[in-house]
């Protein structure tokens, strides 16, 4: 699944967004996906083959997240679309408004909290 050491090599990154003072001038896209494009494969490689995908359980619509991330990592965009659309009729809409409860279910998130706890933060 993806890159076995991806979660060790790459930190979590989010796409950049336009400054709100620029956003209010029009109704255009404010997430700068073009700049993030080269990082998509890197970020999808962070998905581990954890055995029990708690992220899948945490998703209210049941998206098959590990398989989707693997398809993105391999540049299999049609397969990724098929995986998403098998559980979600409108992934292009829900992806914009989703609060990402899968991330809190991810084993990486659990380990991050634990490591911060041990550091006394």
Predicted feature descriptions by range:
Residues 1-121:
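Ferredoxin-type iron-sulfur electron-transfer modules and their immediate structural context
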């Amino acid at each position: 699944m993806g890159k076995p050491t991806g979660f060790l090599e790459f930190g979590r990154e989010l796409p950049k967004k336009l400054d709100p003072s620029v956003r209010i001038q029009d109704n255009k896209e404010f997430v700068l996906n073009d700049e993030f494009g080269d990082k998509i494969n890197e970020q999808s490689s962070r998905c581990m083959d954890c055995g029990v995908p708690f992220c899948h359980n945490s998703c209210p619509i049941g998206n098959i997240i590990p398989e989707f991330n693997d398809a993105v990592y391999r540049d299999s965009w049609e397969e990724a679309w098929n995986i998403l659309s098998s559980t979600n009729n409108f992934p292009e809409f829900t992806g914009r408004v989703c609060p990402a409860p899968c991330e809190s279910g991810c084993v990486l998130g659990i380990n991050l909290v634990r490591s911060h706890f041990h550091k006394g933060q």
